[in-house]
Amino acid sequence: SADAILQNFNLIHDENPKDVLVFGADHVYRMDPMQMFQQHRETNAGITIAAIRVPRSEASEFGCIELAEDGITIKAFHEKPANPPAMPGHPDLTLISMGNYIFKRDVMEEALILDSENLESRHDIGGNIIPMLTAQGQAKVYDFANNVVPGETPRDKGYWRDVGSIDAYYDAHMDLVSVHPIFNLYNREWPVLTNLPPLPPAKFSENGTAVDSIVGAGSIIAGSRVERSVVSFDVQVQPSALIQGTVIMPGVRIGSNVIIRNAIVDKNV
């Protein structure tokens, strides 16, 4: 990841920003980055890392943060440790990196160049760049628990999922289909923006039904039943089919009498 940024650093030079935001693309959450940016500027950090609290028993799959006594300076950064450090005062919790970073531009450039010259480096932000800046005392943490998003509720506040595995990707979709979803797509004060082709509304014909499900635009549920599923746009489900606990990608055609349970169906099949 560090090498990918370095290879494209000419784009950053062209814009010449004072700070650079680097956010991971395989996570699901709702956040106001400006609040993190304000803290970054106020603390004069070389890098600010957004972090979330997770049970210590689950933290070994992530980059773990150990804080100094001031509660904001990062004392040590451990990439996927066998024994994750506990938060002060919370022995069962660990702060993990969300994969969201704000760098001072000059600090980032210097760190990337030094890392590129190290033949033993894996050229990874979490494995190499963050430990380097932590050792220099330049790394601060931003606690995601303090982020306030308009329209959020106690149920969905602080939601974050890493969807880097198939199981996690599936589970994140299932989070959307309960009566009171823990990730709320219906927050009109802070909508999740997307880009869809121009399609008509979803259509239900021949007593087709969808229960506790999301059905995308242009999809047709014809004489079939869909339960606890996410149906993307431009999907057709033929009569007498039964879909349960399934994620269906765009452009899928499901024939009559088909039964699909607890699956992910790839696009255009």
Language model feature labels by segment:
Residues 1-176:
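Unchanged
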Residues 105-106, 110-269:
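Left-handed beta-helix
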